[in-house]
Amino acid sequence: MHNNFYQEDELLNNELSNRGFLLTKVDDVIGWARSNSLWPMTFGLACCAVEMMQAAASRYDMDRFGMLFRPSPRQSDLMIVAGTLTNKMAPALRKVYDQMAEPKWVLSMGSCANGGGYYHFSYSVVRGCDRIVPVDVYVPGCPPTAEALIYGLMQLQKKIKRTTGFKYDARKNH
C-alpha cells in the first residue's frame, strides 16, 4: 500500500515537472528565502572586525550570497559579534540583540568572541558572547580569515534551510 502511494506520488511529480510546475513545501521556500537574504548587523569590537570588513569588500563580496550589511538592528536578522566582549559592553550587546526582529541569528567570530581568547583570564572580559546571547555558529581563529567567516556564513545558511519553519501564532497578532 505504502509503496504504491509513493510510486503514484512520484509519477505525479514527474508529470507536473515536465509541464513546468514546481512542487515543494512552504517551509522549504521560506528556508530558501531566509537563508539567501541574510542582512547582518556588525558588532565589531576588535581586530576581527577588520576581517569582517574584508569579507564584505570586492575580493570576497558577501553580496553574492544575498547578504547586505544593515546599520540598524531593527533591519537586521543576523548579528556578527567580532572581537573581545567586555563586561561593560555586554549589556549593549544584549540590548541590540533584543532590538532585532524575529527570526534572528548570531554568529560569533574569533577566539575572543567565542571564549575570551587571549584575554580569557582578564577580570573585565566576558568568556564567550554565548553567555549573553544565543549563538548559532562559531567561527574560530585569531583573527579568522575572511574565507573562514564566509564559510561560517554558509554553514549558517545550511542551518537555516534545515531548521526553519513557518510559525504563526494568531494570539500574538490580535
UniProtKB/Swiss-Prot annotation:
What subcellular locations does the record give?
Cell inner membrane
Q: Which domain of life is it from?
A: Bacteria
Query: Where does the chain bind [4Fe-4S] cluster?
Result: 47-48, 112, 142
UniProt record similarity statement: Belongs to the complex I 20 kDa subunit family.
Q: What does this protein do?
A: NDH-1 shuttles electrons from NADH, via FMN and iron-sulfur (Fe-S) centers, to quinones in the respiratory chain. Couples the redox reaction to proton translocation (for every two electrons transferred, four hydrogen ions are translocated across the cytoplasmic membrane), and thus conserves the redox energy in a proton gradient.
Main localization (coarse): membrane
The record describes its membrane topology as: Peripheral membrane protein
Its cofactor is: [4Fe-4S] cluster
- Is the Transmembrane helix keyword given for this protein? no
Which reactions does this protein catalyse?
A: a quinone + NADH + 5 H(+)(in) = a quinol + NAD(+) + 4 H(+)(out)
**What top-level class of enzyme does the UniProt entry assign?**
translocase
Q: Which GO terms describe its molecular function?
A: 4 iron, 4 sulfur cluster binding; iron ion binding; NADH dehydrogenase (ubiquinone) activity; NADH:ubiquinone reductase (non-electrogenic) activity; quinone binding
Task: Give a GO biological-process term.
Answer: aerobic respiration
Q: Does the keyword NAD apply?
A: yes
Describe its assembly.
Answer: NDH-1 is composed of 14 different subunits. Subunits NuoB, C, D, E, F, and G constitute the peripheral sector of the complex.
Protein's UniProt name: NADH-quinone oxidoreductase subunit B
Q: How is the cofactor bound?
A: Binds 1 [4Fe-4S] cluster.
Which keywords does the record carry? Answer: 4Fe-4S, Cell inner membrane, Cell membrane, Iron, Iron-sulfur, Membrane, Metal-binding, NAD, Quinone, Translocase, Transport, Ubiquinone
Q: Which HAMAP family match?
A: NDH1_NuoB
